[in-house]
Amino acid sequence: MRPNIHPEYRQVLFHDLTANTYFLVGSTLKTDRTKQWEDGNTYPYVTLDVSSASHPFYTGKQKQIGKEGQVARFGQRFGQFFNKGKDKS
């Protein structure tokens, strides 16, 4: 293998801002920010908006849209095109 072409693999501290959860994971991600972890060591620090701790699929808090709602929304958007030839009485 050629020297000096591979990225540096190290432990990185990820912070999910939505769930306020920290993950210590091996990564090659580059960052200038550092933060001290609960074990006393200082690690590179990266913030996340969504992770497995806050994503609806993993938390089980999914929002389902009913079929009736989708049909009603379609009617609101495109109903005017289907009612052109009909009398409004």
Curated annotation (Swiss-Prot):
A single GO cellular-component term on record: ribosome
PROSITE patterns: RIBOSOMAL_L31
GO molecular function, one term: structural constituent of ribosome
UniProt keyword terms in alphabetical order: Ribonucleoprotein, Ribosomal protein
Gene Ontology biological process terms from the UniProt entry: translation
Keyword Ribosomal protein set for record: yes
Keyword Ribonucleoprotein: yes
InterPro entries, per database record: Ribosomal_bL28/bL31-like_sf, Ribosomal_bL31, Ribosomal_bL31_B, Ribosomal_bL31_sf
Family of this protein: Belongs to the bacterial ribosomal protein bL31 family. Type B subfamily.
Quaternary structure, from the entry: Part of the 50S ribosomal subunit.
Protein name stated in the entry: Large ribosomal subunit protein bL31B
Species this chain originates from: Aeromonas salmonicida (strain A449)
Highest classification ranks of the organism: Bacteria, Pseudomonadati, Pseudomonadota, Gammaproteobacteria, Aeromonadales
UniProt gene name: rpmE2
